[in-house]
Amino acid sequence: MAELNTHVNIKEKIYAVRSVVPNKSNNEIVLVLQQFDFNVDKAVQAFVDGSAIQVLKEWNMTGKKKNNKRKRSKSKQHQGNKDAKDKVERPEVGPLQPQAPLVQNGHMNGCEKDSSSPDSTREKLALTPREKKISILEEPPRAQRGVTEGGRLLQQKMSLDGNPRAIHGPSERSDGPQWSAGQPCNPSKPKAKTSPVKSNAPAAHLEIKPDELAKKRGPNIEKSVKDLQRCTVSLTRYRVMIKEEVDSSVKKIKAAFAELHNCIIDKEVSLMAEMDKVKEEAMDILTARQKKAEELKRLTDLASQMAEMQLAELRAEIKHFVSERKYDEELGKAARFSCDIEQLKAQILICGEITHPKNSYSSRTPCSSLLPLLNTHAVASGKQGNFARKSSGHNKPSEGKAANPKMVSGLANTADACHQTMPTNKQQNGPSSQRRRFNPQYHNRLNGPAKSQGGGNEADPMAKSNSRHEHRRQPHNGFRPKNKGGAKNQEAPLGTKAPEAPPHSEKARRRQHAADNLEARPFRGNVSRVSQCNLCPSRIEVSTEATVLSVPAVTLVA
């Protein structure tokens, strides 16, 4: 009983340490507690300080070269999968729990029957988990030679998760000895029962190994993908920035040249005003000179009345006036605009500067290992494009096939329209004597085999008149050199000879039906169906329509 309480205390200590350090496994906590004589405070301090790693290495945990971050991630993954593993382990641990007392008694076959009291049974159950723990703690040095770290951690978790179940419920404590007492001696059963546990470890190791590799590889590629995504988003932002910068630069250019334009206009206005002032000043000077010249001219007119002294002064005045002629020339050249346009052009050309983008990026080609992937991706995309084009090409003939019935129905509709317009055109086809002169003979020849069926065919003169009307409408449109052979072949089964129509009736028909070209064309399609229907009494009307098409062709050729 004391041993059971001791085990319960150990379990409580494990839970106490785990509450402070949740990312550590039970096996690691037990190892550190054993190192510090099951002192919870020292164990927690060791986990916090990081000295627990050295302690675990001392417990033959060599080969564990991973940092704390990797331990935390793995422990979180193990905690996430703990419930699923417990469900898988419960059916396997259940049958193994009753065998634990038999193994601990030193008898592997379990042949001895335990008839002791319940207290002894509880003591055996209490001893069982501790001895199992000690055996598990001693197993890693032997097992890690051929098993990787993932499989070893899974085996340790399975053993530690299986131990508390043997202690919890009173039903398990009481059922275990009863089952062992009631079982017969069978030395092969314990081996068969313990073998599944050994075989499950490699399987679990094989299942975990790809996941671990993916998780080792995953964070790196995820970080790269995130960096690539950020860079792509920033490219879009820079594109917007370039557009905004260009727009602002265009506005600045327009503003600068608008200011220059305004300055030029202002300068032009000022120069024009100054030129006006110069013109006025020059004109005033010339006006004064003109007045002085006129005054001297009047004095010269009075020279006959002057004395010698006055004449001498007049000559001096005229000489002085004439000597200032050079100033007149300078005055005429002074009113001139001068500007150094070339210098101004040079200043305008160097005015303003635009910085071009620098392509400082490296022209790095993809690695040789990535080129095959890119080529296969390009080939796959090309195949998909070809398949899409082929599928669209396959759909087009079906559309064409679907359009053909529409064309046939359109021909039929035009034929019906022509039949409906025939009675109205009968009044415009000339005198009825011409129709009687030609149609009765033709009617008697074609309807000869139809008379044996009684008066049924005589009751539809409208249909026959329609066929005669079609015969009159056909000569101009239906005549083509290609139809000569077909028309003669269609006349052969009838065994009849087409009579020559009177010339005046033919001319009348040509005048009457010159405007019906488009309505008569749809009936050419009936020629191919006539040869099959000539001998059918029930379809004599169709055959007459078809044979009527051939008669004018022979008539026109003759």
Swiss-Prot record:
Coiled coil: 279-344
Modified residues (Phosphoserine): 120
Name of the molecule in the record: SPATS2-like protein
Spans annotated as Disordered: 63-204, 385-406, 421-514
Compartments, as annotated in UniProt: Cytoplasm; Nucleus, Nucleolus
UniProt-listed InterPro entries: SPATS2-like (IPR009816), UBA-like_sf (IPR009060)
Bias kind Polar residues: ranges: 421-433
GO CC annotation: cytosol; nucleolus; nucleoplasm; protein-containing complex
Family named by the database record: Belongs to the SPATS2 family.
Bias (Basic residues) ranges: 63-79, 469-485
Keywords: Acetylation, Coiled coil, Cytoplasm, Nucleus, Phosphoprotein
Positions of post-translational N-acetylalanine modification: 2
Feature: compositional bias, Basic and acidic residues: 80-92, 110-142
Pfam families attached to this UniProt entry: SPATS2-like
Segments traversing the membrane: none
